[in-house]
Amino acid sequence: MSGESLECATLPDMGLLVRCAEPQDAPVVARVHVDSWRRAYSGLLPQEYLDTLSVEARTKTWAKAFSQLPGQTPTNLVAELDGQIIGIASVGPNRDNDTDTATHELWGLYLDPAHWGAGHGHTLHTGALDVAHASGAAAATLWVLTTNQRARHFYERHGWAADGADKTAWRGDVRLDETRYRLSLRAWAPRTSALADIA
């Protein structure tokens, strides 16, 4: 649940703090979101669409999400490195009609491209799944752009597997073909225990 002043765990080996997002984080989170989309989807989505992505519009969207009451939105976590937000992850109830309440969803995970490859995505991913597990989830799903091989390889390295479901989403007139991944959390061993208190 975002907006609460709760102490989340740090992983000393990474020097990274994973904590609950707060409304004042919205502008930086929006920049991370837009920058990650532009880098990740370059060559995969029309450049003219990527050029129209607005940090200002995303700031309003994230500020609203971070201000919602518990239970109305997914849990939003930010990753801080040396006091600077470099990532955002959202995890919560599953939005698909063919899943049960024991299956949660990783709604999104975005990392500043300047920090790709340093292991921080792994830490943020771990924190998000710790929250899902602490909430009672037995499994989790996520949707990824089918042609985004970098993201698919990241999730596959973390134990996710495509479950056979595909869908087409639209952003205006831009088509996004997506593939669903699933991960069992039955044997999940939480690594950021303080996050369990915010689920």
Predicted stretch roles:
Residues 28, 123-124, 150:
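Charged catalytic carboxylate motif
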Residues 102-104, 138-141, 145-152, 157-161, ...:
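C-terminal "cap" of GNAT-fold acetyltransferases
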Residues 3-6, 20-24, 34-44, 48-114, ...:
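Acetyl-CoA-dependent GNAT
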Residues 112-114, 118, 146-147:
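Active-site acidic-Proline motif in GNAT/NAT acetyltransferases
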Residues 15-17:
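Extreme N-terminal starter segment of soluble prokaryotic enzymes
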Residues 29, 33:
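Hydrophobic pocket/interface hotspot
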